[in-house]
């Protein structure tokens, strides 16, 4: 292992689902808009404003191109959390007098689930659909859940915890046939997997800048123009972004977001090949050296930059402490402060014991083969040590069912 350390910088970043480092090309494009090109894009009376507006519109076009949309259908927001809130609350407010039912999945991101819970208090009926043990939606259950009161179906493209890719095309077809709006939080899939809003009949899509090697604090919402979808804005003000999101646009962040989208558009295939190769290398080496390791979520229908693994018999928190040379997480970054087992893992039927042993490893554009090999060696040696110390692992080897143990409180 010492030999491996020569050209490695520790800790190794493996938390690409929570955020990504800024691509140097993105940073370079942003810098002038912090210094000499500082105009307000809404100032129409001088060249500083025109220059900023042109930069914003170029970025808007690039973001639209990545999902096959028209640039007029892209609204800038502060991130995917705001976009999700704007869709779910805004569409319910606009159409709530006509239809009052929204469908989503139990495994959606917390901001979607909590926005839905907020609406329940306002009298909107929410259906939280279960998912199959592989993490994928059951399309028959979706079909049966839609009623004549259903306004919106909200299903994320790629799950942030387990990486599974939902069948967006099939969901979009069902929604279009039943005249229901289809929203997808595509933050984890945008720029990583091909997504076309017209082919998939997506009416609204939430996007984040910092998941695609762009800056934090900027995101977007795609809102279909034909057939037109309406939302009531959350923020009132000067009427920017076609009245849907008032406030002065942050030109440097938008420029960075646009360049990040352009790079993703041009290099998506190259990035995917790189990530897929490292995924296979990582997983095959782990499987060959450690018994009783489980990949959570469907192995094939997933974005392979996400490996959520359960290591039976060892607590996730103790693994994180043992492998502190790797920046990883247990659960999503938004909920990793909680000691509760991940609600996403519980929703695919994983036992509480196994859910507590889960770690999410992220692979991205800047991950190297050397880093993967170092990570595998470190994980294997530490898991082996932790299992030797673990009475739970010992009991499992003796065939004792942990569910039947009666624990004594002290």
From Swiss-Prot:
GO biological process: [2Fe-2S] cluster assembly
Residues engaged in binding [2Fe-2S] cluster: 334
Keyword check for tRNA processing: no
UniProt pathway: Cofactor biosynthesis; iron-sulfur cluster biosynthesis
Catalytic activity, reaction form: (sulfur carrier)-H + L-cysteine = (sulfur carrier)-SH + L-alanine
Residues reported in the UniProt entry to bind pyridoxal 5'-phosphate: 80-81, 160, 188, 208-210, 248
GO molecular function: 2 iron, 2 sulfur cluster binding; cysteine desulfurase activity; metal ion binding; pyridoxal phosphate binding
InterPro entries from the UniProt entry: Aminotrans_V_dom, Aminotrans_V_PyrdxlP_BS, Cys_deSase_IscS, Cysteine_dSase, PyrdxlP-dep_Trfase, PyrdxlP-dep_Trfase_major, PyrdxlP-dep_Trfase_small
Keywords linked to the UniProt accession: 2Fe-2S, Cytoplasm, Iron, Iron-sulfur, Metal-binding, Pyridoxal phosphate, Transferase
Cofactor list: pyridoxal 5'-phosphate
Main location: cytoplasm
Top EC class for this record: transferase
One Pfam family matching this protein: Aminotran_5
Subcellular location, record wording: Cytoplasm
N6-(pyridoxal phosphate)lysine sites (modified residues): 211
Active site: 334 (cysteine persulfide intermediate)
EC number: 2.8.1.7
Domain of life: Bacteria
GO CC term, one of those recorded: L-cysteine desulfurase complex
Biological role: Master enzyme that delivers sulfur to a number of partners involved in Fe-S cluster assembly, tRNA modification or cofactor biosynthesis. Catalyzes the removal of elemental sulfur atoms from cysteine to produce alanine. Functions as a sulfur delivery protein for Fe-S cluster synthesis onto IscU, an Fe-S scaffold assembly protein, as well as other S acceptor proteins.
PANTHER family (alphabetical): CYSTEINE DESULFURASE, CYSTEINE DESULFURYLASE FAMILY MEMBER
Description of how the protein assembles with itself and partners: Homodimer. Forms a heterotetramer with IscU, interacts with other sulfur acceptors.
Protein name per UniProt: Cysteine desulfurase IscS
Organism: Rickettsia typhi (strain ATCC VR-144 / Wilmington)
GN (gene name): iscS
